[in-house]
Regions:
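Helix-loop junctions and hydrophobic alpha-helical segments within the transmembrane domains
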Residues: 9, 326, 337, 412, ...
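Hydrophobic transmembrane alpha-helices and their membrane-interface caps
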Residues: 30-37, 349-416, 474, 867-954, ...
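Transmembrane helices with small-residue packing motifs
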Residues: 18-19, 25-60, 122-131, 383, ...
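Transmembrane alpha-helices and their membrane-interface boundaries in multi-pass membrane transporters
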Residues: 401-415, 436-456, 463-503, 620, ...
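Extracytoplasmic/periplasmic membrane-proximal domains and adjacent transmembrane bundles
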Residues: 2-5, 12, 54, 125, ...
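Signature of alpha-helical transmembrane segments and their immediate interfacial
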Residues: 2-40, 434-436, 502-550, 591
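Solvent-exposed, non-transmembrane alpha-helical starts
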Residues: 22, 61-68, 105-115, 145-150, ...
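Solvent-exposed, membrane-proximal periplasmic/extracellular interface segments of envelope transport
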Residues: 7-8, 65-139, 198-219, 240, ...
């Protein structure tokens, strides 16, 4: 491309230095403001495209719920556009359906899809079985409760703690950046009316009639309104129950007499029995207070404001009540940003030192002044685009740091060379721009395009890392702009002509390199063969690189999940969870532990998926004093659980750095027949157990729970004046209690529950003796029903409307879940080839997500390749040159694979991003070399000499650019999140640069038949 002097930016900038300085200072000031204003968080936000639809059908078995409730809802839900998958589980009396949208659905349309789903499901409410409550919807899964506090107090009841927690909740709402405040582990109070069946029978009452009397006395109903000439007067009835005494005073008409309810029944107040989900802090009962932050808020500022408020609250709490911090996201964010800031500072120092030593003092000063301007300009761009400071955006700045000086180095070095040859300063600056500016811009855009697939991929992992592309693009384009304007100005001001050097490339080093090039050009076939062999060998070695979607984080938390057999009561789970807590409470590495029974902890970090409530499930969030302590504790907890809780499956895991998977190894078995699915799931589990790298296998649906079927004799019911409802209510009252009404007390809606005296509540072995009250007296259940003892499924899982069992497994130390999953799946080859029609065995978990993400990441690659080729063609204007450059791009894989093996880094999502980004950088370097060959040819040099001398002339700037990029990446080698990408880019660029300087000249000579 030819350059008109009128559009020579460097010359214009030097002539208008005051304007350049003004805008440079303006960018510096705006950049500092932007940096201080940017939101701060640990992870970038991304849209969780899932929704939970739940419904209750009291009294129905899991199979009935699946067939008549879950199935009906799922069939309607699948008609919603852009549904990716539907998973569900059905339990006795409950179904929970999780709906996932396709990754391609834009975040802006997610709420609209959920509204459509609500409307479509509401349309079929009338078709649901009688007695169904709901459906209920939850689509707010992206709220992160990063600050959790536990209120504990010896001698304080749950209700006492709840009241204080409610007051604290109101205080928190007044703090800037607070979005939501939720209470965790609250135990609702209930009023229990207890009496025996004989008393009911004597009074001629049944539970249904008693319930109607109590409900009529506690209901709030309109009493009318008197319309006057100028105002309306509302009539209010007083005396509705608002205390135990008022409930005891409710009149009961029975056998022609009026009794006080308190005279014929015992009235007590207590907590829900069985209890609701519970929370403990360091083994003490607790009420949790969880806060989420406003979108775009500043976590560090929120942390400071919370610290002030907590100090005030603690000073006002009564003696014995303690407010403890369970999760402290602001502190995590502060440490995370501090870590990446240190990496950024280290990278800046490294690049500055390299620039000073390689370019000399004055040229180094020019580069040193460009770096802060580019970085602060990047902060301005981030502020304009609404990109917060977090691990991805800060990491992107570190990655770009080594590249952002490349353009300035080329311009400044060329100015220095021309000035050393006696050129006048303005002419040298003008020549540097005219010669390098547009090829460098083309190369910069190509480098940016290498990151494009991250931004335009439709996977959740890509959305997680999507800020990488805009931050890199802003930074690198700014670096080109600065190299075209400020760098020439500063070079004009500071660089002084040096002694003219004759034959500056006639040194021992360059002579040896020239000899290597000449030998390579004389043995072209051998060089190409060696290169192809190295590439093929590296691809073979790829089999030995470990695969991991996202590594574990460096957070101190350890998530310990406890699963008891299906059908276990929440009380049993509570006992097991407390036992496990006691086993670890004195561990030397433990800082604190919070225990959640019946459900998981709130989502206190974005990359954590909360578990839906289950009676047989508990979660311990163990916070260690250090990362090393966390690793030690994980091993000890596994052994303690195996030795002391053999009835439970206890699995511990650290929090991942990206989208999570519940277990490292996950395989799904789906089919049309429940029995077949169970049979083949058991076979899959056997194969999984046979793998020495897999431990603690479990299936999410297998065990059955006890059940008793009551065959009612309708004729006897008729003779005794009973109904099925009367029998059901009598059974419920005697087994678990029957809610007959509720009343308002303060801000609470308290249920009134009727149940029989404790000594009359039946156990499973005495069901036949349960008394059923009739008008003639109580009769045993055996007189009206035949009992059949058996078992039934307590949980039925489905995926896309088909019965599905997921077989899960943990892994031993030193292997990755993706590698082990693939091995187990390969071991199932024979079983998979002989499956009955309709049966499927599929990969799940992290490996499935990884494959899906890679597929999504590759979708935009054709567009990226086309854009890169268009730019190359416009710049080079020769198809053979374009082909040569494109061929060199894969050479980076040689260094990538050997680098991953050398540093024991996994091939995962971040490494895949590094490979794509690396291609753009390699193409950029190759283009610069090809452009130099053309310049020498245009100057009249012989083709062979042009090829050789171009590689020599460009050796220093290309190596220097690669060297600064690689050294700038070194701080990220120590980052858990960025390690794989840093290793990929550093090792790939090192290998590709060395090969490019030798192989590209050979390919050029072959393509153009240079002799």
């Amino acid at each position: 491309m030819k350059e008109d002097n009128k559009s020579n930016w460097a010359e214009w900038a030097i002539k208008h230095r005051q304007i350049v300085y003004f805008f440079s200072v303006l960018v510096l000031v705006m950049g500092i403001f932007s940096f201080k204003t940017l939101g701060r968080s640990e992870d970038p936000s991304f849209t969780v495209k899932q929704m939970v639809v739940s419904a209750a059908w009291p009294g129905a078995s899991a199979k009935d719920v699946e067939m008549h409730l879950t199935n009906t809802l799922e069939k309607q839900i699948q008609n919603v556009p852009q549904i990716d998958k539907i998973t569900s589980y059905s339990r006795p009396g409950t179904c929970v359906i999780t709906v996932y949208l396709k990754d391609e659905v834009p975040s802006s349309q997610v709420r609209q899809r959920w509204l459509e789903l609500r409307n479509m499901v509401n349309d079929i409410k009338k078709d649901l079985p009688d007695g169904v409550y709901g459906p209920y919807y939850n689509d707010r899964f992206d709220d992160v409760y990063g600050n959790i506090y536990a209120l504990t107090g010896d001698g304080y009841s749950y209700e006492d703690m709840r009241k204080y927690a409610e007051e604290i909740k109101l205080d928190f709402f007044g703090i800037p950046d607070v979005k939501k405040v939720e209470l965790v582990g609250v135990q609702p109070e209930k009023v229990y009316i207890q009496m025996d069946t004989d008393k009911l029978a004597q009074l001629g009452l049944d539970i249904n009639s008693l319930a109607e009397i109590i409900k009529a006395q506690t209901a709030i109903t309109p009493s009318g309104m008197v319309e006057a000439d100028k105002s309306n007067t509302y009539l209010r009835l007083t005396g509705s129950p608002d205390s135990l005494q008022n409930i005891a005073d409710i009149p009961i008409n029975a056998n022609g007499k009026v009794f006080r309810l308190g005279d014929i029944a015992q009235i007590k107040r207590g907590y829900a029995d069985p209890p609701e989900s519970k929370m403990y802090f360091n083994g003490k009962p607790a009420v949790g207070i969880a806060l989420s932050m406003e979108d775009g808020g500043d976590n560090i500022r929120l942390g400071k404001n919370l610290a002030k408020e907590i100090k005030k609250i603690q000073s006002e709490l009564p003696l014995g009540l303690e407010l403890n911090q369970v999760a402290n996201q602001p502190e995590v964010v502060k440490n995370s940003i501090s870590e990446f800031s240190e990496s950024l500072y280290e990278a800046i120092i490294i690049v500055l030192v390299v620039s000073l030593f390689s370019l000399g003092r004055r040229s180094g000063y020019v580069i040193s002044c460009c770096i802060p301007l580019i970085l602060l300009g990047a902060f301005c761009g981030m502020y304009a685009l609404g990109i917060d400071l977090h691990k991805v955006s800060l990491g992107a700045l570190v990655v770009s740091l080594g590249m952002l000086v490349d353009d300035a180095i080329v311009v400044v070095e060329l100015m220095e060379v021309k000035m050393s040859e006696g050129w006048e300063r303005m002419k040298a600056a003008s020549y540097a721009f005219k010669t390098c500016a547009w090829p460098l811009l083309c190369g910069t855009v190509i480098t940016c395009l290498g990151f494009m697939p991250i931004a335009f991929s439709d996977s959740s992992a890509s959305e997680f890392a999507s800020s990488l592309f805009p931050v890199m693009t802003i930074t690198l384009l700014l670096s080109w702009l600065v190299s075209a304007t400020l760098a020439p100005v500063l070079g004009y001001e500071w660089i002084r002509p040096t002694v003219i050097k004759e034959e500056s490339y006639d040194t021992p080093f360059y002579n040896k390199f020239r000899s290597l090039l000449q030998w390579s050009l004389s043995h072209r076939a051998l060089v190409v063969g060696i290169t192809v062999g190295l590439f093929a060998f590296s691809i073979f070695m790829l089999n030995f690189v470990k695969k991991e979607f996202f590594p574990a984080s460096v957070r101190p938390e350890l998530l310990v999940e406890l699963n008891l057999p299906e059908g276990s009561s929440i009380k049993t789970t509570d006992e097991a969870a407390q036992k496990l807590t006691k086993l670890i409470e004195n561990d030397e590495d433990l800082d604190h532990v919070s225990t959640y029974v019946g459900k998981s902890a709130p989502r206190f970090v974005l990359v954590m998926d909360p578990v839906q409530p289950r009676d047989n499930y508990a979660q311990l969030v163990v916070v260690a004093k250090s990362i090393e302590g966390r690793i030690r504790m994980e091993k000890r907890i596994t052994k303690l659980a195996a030795d002391n809780l053999p009835e439970a499956i206890v699995y511990s895991r650290s929090i991942p750095l990206g989208p999570p998977a519940p277990y490292p190894v996950m395989l799904r078995v789906s089919g049309d027949n429940d029995a077949q699915v169970k049979e083949y799931a058991q076979k899959v589990r056997q194969v999984m157990n046979a793998n020495p790298e897999v431990t603690m296998t479990r299936m999410d649906w297998m065990e059955q729970s006890n059940a008793v079927k009551l065959k009612i004799d309708n004729d006897k019911l008729l003779q005794m004046g009973l109904t099925r409802q009367t029998v059901a209510m009598a059974l419920q009252a005697q087994v678990s209690g029957y809610t007959v009404a509720s009343y308002l007390e303060g801000d609470q809606d308290i249920d009134i529950v009727f149940r029989l005296d404790p000594d009359q509540r039946a156990d499973i072995t005495q069901l036949e003796t349960v008394s059923i009250p009739t008008s003639q007296g109580a009769v045993p259940l055996a007189q009206v029903a035949t009992l059949e003892y058996g078992s039934e499924d307590n949980m039925i899982w489905r995926r896309n409307l088909r019965p599905t069992i997921t077989v899960n497994g943990a892994i031993v130390e030193g292997v990755t879940g993706n590698d082990v999953t693939q091995k187990v799946y390969d071991d199932l080859k024979e079983l998979r080839s002989n499956l009955p029609a309709g049966m499927k065995i599929e990969i799940g978990g992290s490996l499935e997500d990884s494959n899906k993400t890679l597929k999504g990441l590759l979708k935009p690659v054709p567009v990226m390749i086309i854009l890169i080729m268009v730019l190359l063609m416009l710049q080079l204007q020769d198809i053979r040159k374009l082909i040569i450059i494109v061929i060199t791009a894969p050479l980076g894989m040689i260094g990538v694979i050997f680098g991953l093996l050398l540093f024991n880094s996994p091939l995962g999502f971040m490494a895949e991003l590094g490979v794509l980004a690396l291609c753009g950088t390699i193409i950029r370097n190759s283009m610069v070399l090809v452009d130099q060959i053309q310049q020498h040819l245009d100057a009249g040099m012989e083709p062979m000499s042009a090829i050789t001398e171009s590689a020599i002339v460009r050796f220093r700037p290309i190596m220097l650019a690669a060297f600064t990029t690689v050294l700038g990446l070194i701080p990220l080698f120590f980052s858990q999140f960025w390690n794989a990408m840093a290793v990929t880019m550093a090792c790939g660029l090192t290998g590709a640069t060395l090969l490019t300087l030798v192989v590209l000249p050979v390919l050029y000579a072959i393509a153009f038949k240079v002799k």
